């Protein structure tokens, strides 16, 4: 056989592999409004940068008629490429090949990509579209899942891991995305659940649709399992590229800086008009973020889950920062179980990858109620406290209005190790809100008053003027300065420059025991 013959043979084999499950199954994928695995990779990566691993690998199973079944690439496409010129590793389940079911070789290919990503120090992107375990391979499939889960855990905090759910993801397969840093879902076409609607109906009698049980809306607004939901696969892939622009390649690199387009000395006078004079009147914390961050740079995370706290990425003078902010428009910005978990997880991600954290505080306390207490608000609220306390990245805090009680401590206070703490003149920093304090401190006087309501209003105003202000905390050094809102942006940019070389180490230990 000549070299020309051998090259022709190679090209034929490669062409066969590129067809996946064949034209009929590719057409079926398109009919469902879904791209194929290769189309997703080609769309996601910079043009011409994808280099595939193990294109010719296939299963080793000879039971249940599998010896007669050819599975190109064993149903998964793996390799590396570039996003905006930076290396990423990617795997994509190929639903056209045996439903993208996971077998032994399938798992080995994914593990190889994950191992290489950790060696190189580059993000891993998983494009999930799989029917689940390959039953024909039995326990070998379960072993494959376990190998992937272990690598997800080992890679956590080492390289960014991002999952996109672009079809079914059921049973044990759901745990790999759950172990990654961010999960994207596509409305109407992607689903995640451990037990499906049929099993639930058989066991409990409950009837539920796929979307109600594990659709994108369910997991972004109710369970919090997913971080982003998009209308199309293309939008999901575009958003992943955008997310990567804020992130470093690994845990020993700093996040990338883009060329700034917004004046670092810009004075945001509009911030003076945002916080209402009435302490109970809500406002949108996004208006504050838009005035402080580089224009148009905020990228929200989990926007539909636990809306009383806002988290996401932004830029200050081109530098990536993580944002954690109470949202006064939702439940007055109180902290509850879901908000505490959402904030804690995001803080720990930022700390893992050297992303400074900027916190905006307007919190009247933790949400009261038997439901919160019985479901463990003490334990869950402690997660947020724990996350801030263990963080070693630069921590900058701005108190815009309320900072009451234990919630003041929890929200990146100086006592937890924040580097820079500012308060606006509208800040009310106190052990509790004026109304509650007055009811306790002046109970006897109020009971004896001719007009208790009028006297209560007078005492509340006196308490607010004397105690619920930023100056007592400033006198104690609990805030570094009381600043005009318009100066917030340029002060924080200067502080970020100052903190760039921050080095903080924690006591030697295997790992902490966060109150899970």
UniProtKB/Swiss-Prot annotation:
Annotated keywords: Ligase, Lyase
GO molecular function: lyase activity; propionyl-CoA carboxylase activity
GO cellular component, one term: acetyl-CoA carboxylase complex
Pathway participation: Metabolic intermediate metabolism; propanoyl-CoA degradation; succinyl-CoA from propanoyl-CoA: step 1/3
Domain CoA carboxyltransferase N-terminal: 3-259
InterPro entries registered for this protein in UniProt: AccD/PCCB, AcCoA_carboxyl_beta, ClpP/crotonase-like_dom_sf, COA_CT_C, COA_CT_N
Gene3D superfamilies membership: 2-enoyl-CoA Hydratase, Chain A, domain 1
Keyword Lyase: yes
Disordered: annotated segments: 1-32
EC number: 6.4.1.3
Disruption phenotype: Cells lacking pccB and pccX genes accumulate a high level of propionyl-CoA, which would then inhibit CoA-dependent enzymes such as succinyl-CoA synthetase and could partially inhibit the TCA cycle. Also affected in growth and glucose utilization. Cells are unable to produce PHBV and show morphological abnormalitiess such as a decrease of PHBV granules.
Keyword Chloroplast: no
Catalysed reaction, written as an equation: propanoyl-CoA + hydrogencarbonate + ATP = (S)-methylmalonyl-CoA + ADP + phosphate + H(+)
CoA carboxyltransferase C-terminal domain boundaries: 263-509
PANTHER family to which the protein is assigned, alphabetical: PROPIONYL-COA CARBOXYLASE BETA CHAIN, PROPIONYL-COA CARBOXYLASE BETA CHAIN, MITOCHONDRIAL
Similarity section: Belongs to the AccD/PCCB family.
Function: Part of the propionyl coenzyme A carboxylase (PCC) complex involved in propionate utilization and in the production of the poly(3-hydroxybutyrate-co-3-hydroxyvalerate)(PHBV), which is a water-insoluble biopolymer used as intracellular energy reserve material when cells grow under conditions of nutrient limitation. The complex catalyzes the carboxylation of propionyl-CoA to methylmalonyl-CoA. PCC is also able to catalyze the carboxylation of acetyl-CoA.
Complex and partners: The propionyl coenzyme A carboxylase (PCC) complex is composed of three subunits: PccA (biotin carboxylase and biotin-carboxyl carrier), PccB (carboxyltransferase) and PccX.
Name recorded for this polypeptide: Propionyl-CoA carboxylase, carboxyltransferase subunit
Organism in which the protein naturally occurs: Haloferax mediterranei (strain ATCC 33500 / DSM 1411 / JCM 8866 / NBRC 14739 / NCIMB 2177 / R-4) (Halobacterium mediterranei)
Taxonomic path: Archaea, Methanobacteriati, Methanobacteriota, Stenosarchaea group, Halobacteria
């Amino acid at each position: 056989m000549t070299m020309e013959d051998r090259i022709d043979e190679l090209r034929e084999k490669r062409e066969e592999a590129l067809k996946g499950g064949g034209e009929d199954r590719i057409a079926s994928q398109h009919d469902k409004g879904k791209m194929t695995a290769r189309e997703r990779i080609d769309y996601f990566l910079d043009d011409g940068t994808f280099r595939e691993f193990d294109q010719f690998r296939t299963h080793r199973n000879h039971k249940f008629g599998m010896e007669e079944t050819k599975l190109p690439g064993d149903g998964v496409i793996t390799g590396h490429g570039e996003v905006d010129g930076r290396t990423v590793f990617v795997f994509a389940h190929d639903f056209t090949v045996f439903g993208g079911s996971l077998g032994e070789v399938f798992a080995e290919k994914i593990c190889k990509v994950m191992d290489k990503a950790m060696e190189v120090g580059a993000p891993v992107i998983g494009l999930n579209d799989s029917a689940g375990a390959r039953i024909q391979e039995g326990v070998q499939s379960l072993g494959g899942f376990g190998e992937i889960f272990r690598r997800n855990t080992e890679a956590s905090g080492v390289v960014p891991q991002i999952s996109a759910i672009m079809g079914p993801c059921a049973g044990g397969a759901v745990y790999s995305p759950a172990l990654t840093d961010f999960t994207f879902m596509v409305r109407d076409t992607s689903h995640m659940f451990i037990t499906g609607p049929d099993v639930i109906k058989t066991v409990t009698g409950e009837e539920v649709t796929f979307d109600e049980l594990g659709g994108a809306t369910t997991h972004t607004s109710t369970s919090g399992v997913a971080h982003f939901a998009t209308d199309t696969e293309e939008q999901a892939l575009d958003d992943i590229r955008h997310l990567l622009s804020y992130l470093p390649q690994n845990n020993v690199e700093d996040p990338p800086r883009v060329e700034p387009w917004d004046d670092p000395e810009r004075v945001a006078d509009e911030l003076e008009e945002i916080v209402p004079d009435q302490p109970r009147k809500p406002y949108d914390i996004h208006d504050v973020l838009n005035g402080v961050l580089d224009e148009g740079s905020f990228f929200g995370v989990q926007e539909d889950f636990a809306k009383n706290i806002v988290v996401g990425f932004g830029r200050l003078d081109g530098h990536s920062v993580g944002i954690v902010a109470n949202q006064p428009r939702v439940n007055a910005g109180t902290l509850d179980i879901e908000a505490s978990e959402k904030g804690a997880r995001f803080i720990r991600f930022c700390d893992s990858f050297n992303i400074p954290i900027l916190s905006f505080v307007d919190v009247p306390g933790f949400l009261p109620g038997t439901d919160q207490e019985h479901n463990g608000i003490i334990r869950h609220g402690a997660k947020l406290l724990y996350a801030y306390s263990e963080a070693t990245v630069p921590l900058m805090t701005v108190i815009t209005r309320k900072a009451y009680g234990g919630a003041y401590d929890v929200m990146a206070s100086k006592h937890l190790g924040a580097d820079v703490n500012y308060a606006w003149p509208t800040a009310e920093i106190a052990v509790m809100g004026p109304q509650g304090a007055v009811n306790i401190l002046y109970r006897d006087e109020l009971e004896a008053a001719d007009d208790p309501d009028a006297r209560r209003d007078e005492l509340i105003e006196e308490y607010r003027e004397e105690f619920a202000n930023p100056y007592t905390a400033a006198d104690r050094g609990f805030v570094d300065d009381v600043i005009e809102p318009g100066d917030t942006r340029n002060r924080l940019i200067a502080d970020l420059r100052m903190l760039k070389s921050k080095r903080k180490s924690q006591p030697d230990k295997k790992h902490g025991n966060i109150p899970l």
